[in-house]
Amino acid sequence: LHDESLALTDRYLTAVDEAASDSADAVRLAKRHGLEPDVLAAWLDYLAFGPAQPVEITGLFTKKMERVGGSDYVNGWGLPETPSVVANSSDAEYRIPGRARARGVEVHPSPTLFVAVGWQSPIDGEITVSAKVADAHPECGNGGEWWVQNHTSRKVGNLGHGVYGTGGGGELKPVTLQVHRGDVVRLVVGPKDGSHACDLTHADMTL
């Protein structure tokens, strides 16, 4: 079976390509192409192809944070001791003690828990994503690390990644990708070298 399957690689790859736009399962696809279902399923798994399913989002913050830094306009979710995500709904910048930008979103990881902001696609189609992060508490700390990820039901792919020092930041230039309904695009921020001190971070993602 091994040698026979290798000899039919081109036919298996044709079936895999068809799976990207076909809701048929591996058994029906294999039957359609005269292939072994188990072997085709292995190809689909290896290449992360197959019918798309909505991504189940876990680890959501459940505790509200209100009047962060004493401001009525800075509120969010998380834990006072981190991790957390907050938004400033006003046209003024506030110290919380890092800088909460006007109309901005700030995130703060813990030493072991990263924090993310994301978007779950309501469509099947093409999108363009870009992102920026910047140190929001540049007077201290050692910087941070960031990722922009495309999370589907079959894989998590990195669209961009970077590490920055104190007062620094990072940017993902516009990237175009195909998404399915239920896929998630997220901006993730973590501590640099496990140190989360002063890691309040400006988080911007545009889709």
Language-model segments: which ranges?
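Low-complexity, glycine/serine/threonine/alanine-rich intrinsically disordered linker
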Residues: 1-207
